[in-house]
Amino acid sequence: MVRIAGTDIPDNKQVYFSLQYIFGIGPARSEKVLVQAGVDKAIRVNKLTDEEINRLREIIDKEYRVEGDLRKEIALNIKRLIDIGCYRGNRHKHNLPVRGQRTKTNARTRRGPRKTVAGRGQKRGATKK
């Protein structure tokens, strides 16, 4: 396996798809890196020469923020929003959707599993017999 930016990328796949295993590199950025390095995107990783692998490593390390650095930057951005006390920061702090989605129903992924409340199973106004 080839190791680029601290991530093992699979040997048996095309370079275009293998680069996407690195956090911070998606389809568009993968293609951009391959064009800059002058590597065919259809070639498999195990067919790459050492020179091509080094060019890919160099381009990714110099020009893009990936893996740990990117994760750290994202975490610091969220922390900054929380520290300044803005609306988005408060939404992050309370584990609610940040981008304006409804929360009366749905938003279960962000809010977590339902918290059951005693006595909520009956309809209002109904009396027991």
Curated annotation (Swiss-Prot):
Gene name in the database record: rpsM
Alphabetical list of HAMAP family matching this protein: Ribosomal_uS13
Any Gene Ontology biological process: translation
Residue stretches spanning the membrane: none
SUPFAM superfamilies from the UniProt entry: S13-like H2TH domain (SSF46946)
Keyword rRNA-binding in annotation: yes
Stated role: Located at the top of the head of the 30S subunit, it contacts several helices of the 16S rRNA. In the 70S ribosome it contacts the 23S rRNA (bridge B1a) and protein L5 of the 50S subunit (bridge B1b), connecting the 2 subunits; these bridges are implicated in subunit movement. Contacts the tRNAs in the A and P-sites.
UniProt key word Nucleus: no
GO molecular function, one term: tRNA binding
Assembly information from the UniProt record: Part of the 30S ribosomal subunit. Forms a loose heterodimer with protein S19. Forms two bridges to the 50S subunit in the 70S ribosome.
The protein's name: Small ribosomal subunit protein uS13
Family recorded in the similarity comment: Belongs to the universal ribosomal protein uS13 family.
Region (Disordered): 92-129
Composition bias, Basic residues: 92-114
InterPro entries in UniProt: Rbsml_uS13_C, Ribosomal_uS13, Ribosomal_uS13-like_H2TH, Ribosomal_uS13_bac-type, Ribosomal_uS13_CS
Entries under NCBIfam families matching the protein: uS13_bact
Lineage: Bacteria, Bacillati, Chloroflexota, Dehalococcoidia, Dehalococcoidales
Pfam families documented for this protein: Ribosomal_S13
A GO cellular component annotation in the UniProt record: small ribosomal subunit
Organism whose genome encodes this protein: Dehalococcoides mccartyi (strain ATCC BAA-2266 / KCTC 15142 / 195)
